[in-house]
């Protein structure tokens, strides 16, 4: 039924009611019915327009995929980035437990790697590209009892840059495992001293980085992964 026919029916009904109604009460009833009829027609017309222009009601099937057009590219980007391997230089080398009296770094191990241009040359990591790098290293010392003289343990990360010839210390730490004051207190008890170094630095292509200690005889190789050295490009 069209809107024009609905309005025509309402007008005819109002005319009939006006003929049948008599006096003031009839006029008031006719006015109320007319107002109710007008609101009913207006509501029906509004509902018809909303349905006709698709403002309300179920969406068309061809419009559903468009609702996700702004979401799909983001999801696809996240999925593709998670699959794309990083091309940034990275290295993680571990100490050789078979090298007695020295700290020798190895890359050919299951828990070590050299990737995207980083090289291990003469026990030093060679930087392949300019940029910011996270440099880190850890060593673990152990001993049995304390000697008469204090034991000083040092761990240092140095840089030999291509722009200037002298070696410069980037990170350094020193520890003493023995703090007893009398021989009676210096019993033959085992001690352990870890030293961790880490920081972010601007490096140049060709820079050589080394991680060194002063007391290699105290290194603890009992467990794999306790002594390591690495860089990560940021």
UniProtKB/Swiss-Prot annotation:
Residues 57-234 are extracellular. Residues 1-35 are cytoplasmic. The soluble form derives from the membrane form by proteolytic processing. The membrane-bound form is further proteolytically processed by SPPL2A or SPPL2B through regulated intramembrane proteolysis producing TNF intracellular domains (ICD1 and ICD2) released in the cytosol and TNF C-domain 1 and C-domain 2 secreted into the extracellular space. Glycans are attached at residue 81. The record marks 34-35, 39-40, 49-52, 77-78 as: Cleavage. Cytokine that binds to TNFRSF1A/TNFR1 and TNFRSF1B/TNFBR. It is mainly secreted by macrophages and can induce cell death of certain tumor cell lines. It is potent pyrogen causing fever by direct action or by stimulation of interleukin-1 secretion and is implicated in the induction of cachexia, Under certain conditions it can stimulate cell proliferation and induce cell differentiation. Induces insulin resistance in adipocytes via inhibition of insulin-induced IRS1 tyrosine phosphorylation and insulin-induced glucose uptake. CDD domains: TNF (cd00184). It comes from Equus caballus (Horse). It comes from the Eukaryota. One of its GO terms (biological process) is positive regulation of MAP kinase activity. It is a single-pass type II membrane protein. InterPro entries: TNF, TNF_alpha, TNF_CS, TNF_dom, Tumour_necrosis_fac-like_dom. The gene is TNF. Its main location: membrane. It is found in: Cell membrane. A lipid is attached at residues 19-20 (N6-myristoyl lysine). This is Tumor necrosis factor. PANTHER family: TUMOR NECROSIS FACTOR (PTHR11471:SF23), TUMOR NECROSIS FACTOR FAMILY MEMBER (PTHR11471). Keywords: Cell membrane, Cytokine, Disulfide bond, Glycoprotein, Lipoprotein, Membrane, Myristate, Phosphoprotein, Secreted, Signal-anchor, Transmembrane, Transmembrane helix. Residues 89-234 form the THD domain. GO terms for cellular component: extracellular space; plasma membrane.
